[in-house]
Amino acid sequence: MQKIEFEKSKIFNKPKIQTKRHTEIIESLEKMLEKGVPDLTMSEFASKLKISLRTLYEIAPSKDKLILMTMDNILTKLGKHALDSVSNIESPIRRLEKYLFIVNQAVGPKFDRFMKDIEKINGSKKMADYHENFISTYTEKLLNEAIEKKEIQQINTKVFAVLFSTIGREFLNEKNRKSISTTPDENANSITSIILNGIKLKN
């Protein structure tokens, strides 16, 4: 059986020597950017964070990379939290349902403003794709385990894994957001539950 473990995203080059101070700065950036991406220069970011511009450039070489790296950290923490939260659940299908509900928070109200702003930044799709691919791989693994344990019917697990990993982004689409009153994460969780219940075997 393939073993899948959480690992830090490798799509961004981290500082060669990440000090405790660097970590504190990145955490401050996470809190700042959860409220939306401010229209600031690197110099203004440094001023807001009360650090030198040189220190900020040690963390990221440009504003876009700084923002993307910070969002990558936020999504990475959410992914690790999701994996930790389901680690003691024996049933693969119950583990999957809880895992997907947690990772769907990435399109929820907490990240609402930020996710809309970050779409304009070059490289954001690559970052989102990286995290979606991880979700898809882990989801496929759990679906295969659920079939082996006769919890769900025979399905194309790769197809369903891709579907589950991309539902949230579809509901985050501006056109869909305007036409649907409920939040993207609520919509994603609702569809996820319907699909999972539809493929479960009744014992």
Model-inferred region functions:
Residues 1-9, 137-149, 166, 173, ...:
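C-terminal peripheral helix-coil segments that are non-catalytic and often amphipathic
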